[in-house]
């Protein structure tokens, strides 16, 4: 099967200019200057060292006096010493300047990751591209830093090559032609191997991602109990070994390609050197040059071959690094699907109440074969408490993502006060919502910072009030440093680990602290028992009177207090109405409610017998 190729978006020259702009933006214009100076110094070192012995022989051959020989030695040795000293100094001096440029790119990657739109953050192709971008900036040997070193090596080889070419102009034109043909062949071989690596970068990234995931889960302190209780170690080891074997197979395949490339390179180099020595010796035996010229040309042929190989090698390396920089640039330049800048301002509402309407909305995830939601017509009235219920996978969370503006519908429109939300600045639109999702993130920071989501201007009294409403007052009182206690142990050794239920209560406190006009709860209490869930939902019912609220749950009893309940089934609104109205109809909602009620009654009876 023919492999699908992916043409690089940028050429080598374009990426070099881009890196120059990055160095300038990082206030490190000295990086390219260092590279040029070192290239000149290293070229001077090689050329002066090559000329030293032939010039002495030429002086002796011409019968020059001792003073001339001594002066020749002094000049060439002096140039050699100065160039060597400059080269040695510049071997390490520019390192921190190159690191500064790379760190600036790392900051850009992190910023892009933090601010890119939600659809991009869930797109597998974007996540692969992100990993490749990180790989291009991960250490001192990566493309974004090593490029400067290899540019310097290429300049060194190119400058030296020109000098040695001029020295060999007195030799046979057939010699130069032979060198050109063999080196051109070597160039195309190296180009093919670089393109092979670029074509298989996605495969390598996928294997690396899988290995990182398995390793991360195996080291997780949060999952440590589950791994031990359920005896998951052999399974994790088996998955790790399987992934490692897949990586080994890929590396073996890659190294096999590299091996045969190196074999071809070696053959071409041997042919090139053999032809060079053949033409040079034939000209010498014919009496076309003296002893000094012979020694000079003899040395120049070896240096010429070495620098020609250097040009080809560095050109291949630069091309490979350019391909890695292409992935970095592609990630940083990913277009945003939303209006994150510009766009219309939100409509002003004195009472802070907004109407949300879904107009014939359908949504299909990228790569999916069927719609998750289809033909949804829904109006969330200002101040309404709306519940969305249904079985797992019915599309409840997707509906919330559309309301929040995390996704745009595949068909139809989402309207805010009658205007399409795609016309608004999406960052401003997000300020209308405070949400708690089933999957959440807790920062490695203090408790109060996790609630307030900031380090400055924290209202401590308000933080305590929100924690109390979320039912965490007693837990906070037991913490060693009260609100200053660190959460998590990945960064802080003195951090505490909260239980799953406590984490979700913390998320509720965070939502209360933001106090946005619209509240969305996407099954945040799923880890709690039904009684605890009902208790928290009842608290929210009391706290959100007159405030637009959307509650998502698969436990129908927890949302009875809502003004209206939607039952999502198969991606459509199957039923809607109040709890009492839906029970009276005797439809799907009533059936699900009866099944769940029966389950909890039986569970309660069993607990009582125990």
Predicted stretch roles:
Residues 413-415, 430, 448-493, 537-538, ...:
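ABC ATPase nucleotide-binding domain helical subdomain, centered on the C-loop/LSGGQ "ABC signature"
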Residues 482, 538, 546, 555-610:
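C-terminal portion of ABC ATPase nucleotide-binding domains
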Residues 232, 276, 295-333:
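Cytosolic ends of transmembrane helices, especially the final helix of ABC transmembrane type-1 domains
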Residues 130, 415, 473-506, 515, ...:
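ABC-fold ATPase nucleotide-binding domain signature/coupling loops
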């Amino acid at each position: 099967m023919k492999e699908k190729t992916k043409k690089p978006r940028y050429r080598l020259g374009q990426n070099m200019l881009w890196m120059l702009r990055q160095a300038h933006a990082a206030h490190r214009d000295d990086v390219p200057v260092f590279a040029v100076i070192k290239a000149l110094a290293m070229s001077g070192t090689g050329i002066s060292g090559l000329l030293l012995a032939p010039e002495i022989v030429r002086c002796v051959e011409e019968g020059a006096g001792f003073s001339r020989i001594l002066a020749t030695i002094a000049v060439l040795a002096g140039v050699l010493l100065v160039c060597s000293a400059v080269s040695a100094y510049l071997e390490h001096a520019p390192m921190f300047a190159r690191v500064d440029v790379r760190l600036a790119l790392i900051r850009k990657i992190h910023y892009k990751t933090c601010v890119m739109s939600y659809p991009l953050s869930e797109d597998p192709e974007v996540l692969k591209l992100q990993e490749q971008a990180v790989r291009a900036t991960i250490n001192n040997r990566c493309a974004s830093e090593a490029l400067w070193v290899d540019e310097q090596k290429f300049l060194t080889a190119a400058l030296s090559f020109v000098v040695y070419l001029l020295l060999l102009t007195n030799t046979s034109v057939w010699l130069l032609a032979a060198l050109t043909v063999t080196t051109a062949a070597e160039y195309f071989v190296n180009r093919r191997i670089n393109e092979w690596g670029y074509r298989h970068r996605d495969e390598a990234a996928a294997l690396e991602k899988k290995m990182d995931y398995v390793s991360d889960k195996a080291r997780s302190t949060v999952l440590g109990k589950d791994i031990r209780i359920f005896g998951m170690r052999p399974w994790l080891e088996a998955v790790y070994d399987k992934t490692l074997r897949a990586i080994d197979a890929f590396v073996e395949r890659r190294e096999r390609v590299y091996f045969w490339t190196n074999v071809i390179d070696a053959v071409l180099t041997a042919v090139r050197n053999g032809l060079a020595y053949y033409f040079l010796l034939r000209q010498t035996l014919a009496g076309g040059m003296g002893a000094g010229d012979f020694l000079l040309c003899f040395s120049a042929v070896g240096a010429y071959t070495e620098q020609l190989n250097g040009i080809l090698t560095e050109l291949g390396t630069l091309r490979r690094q350019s391909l890695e920089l292409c992935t970095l640039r592609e990630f940083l330049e990913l277009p945003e699907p939303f209006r994150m800048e510009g766009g219309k301002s939100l409509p002003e509402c004195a009472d802070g109440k907004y109407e949300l309407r879904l107009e014939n909305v359908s949504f299909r995830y990228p790569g999916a074969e069927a719609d998750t939601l289809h033909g949804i017509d829904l109006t969330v009235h200002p101040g309404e408490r709306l519940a969305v219920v249904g079985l797992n996978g019915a599309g409840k969370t997707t509906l919330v993502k559309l309301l929040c503006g995390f996704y745009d519908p595949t068909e139809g429109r989402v309207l805010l006060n009658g205007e399409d939300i795609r016309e608004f600045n999406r960052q401003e639109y997000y300020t209308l919502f405070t949400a708690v999702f089933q999957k959440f993130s807790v920062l490695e920071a203090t408790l109060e910072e996790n609630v307030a989501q900031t380090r400055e201007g924290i209202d401590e009294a308000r933080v305590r009030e929100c924690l109390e409403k979320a039912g965490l007052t007693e837990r906070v009182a037991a913490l060693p440093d009260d609100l200053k206690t660190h959460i998590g142990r990945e960064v802080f050794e003195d951090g505490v680990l909260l239980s799953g239920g406590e984490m979700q209560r913390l998320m509720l406190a965070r939502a209360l602290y933001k106090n946005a006009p619209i509240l969305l709860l996407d099954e945040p209490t799923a880890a709690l028992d039904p009684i605890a869930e009902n208790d928290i939902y009842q608290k929210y019912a009391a706290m959100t009177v007159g405030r637009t609220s959307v509650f998502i749950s698969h436990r129908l009893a927890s949302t009875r207090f809502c003004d209206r309940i939607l039952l999502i089934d198969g991606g459509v609104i199957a039923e809607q109405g109040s709890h009492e109205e839906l029970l009276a109809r005797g439809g799907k909602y009533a059936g699900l409610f009866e099944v769940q009620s029966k389950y909890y009654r039986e569970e309660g009876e069993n607990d009582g017998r125990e």
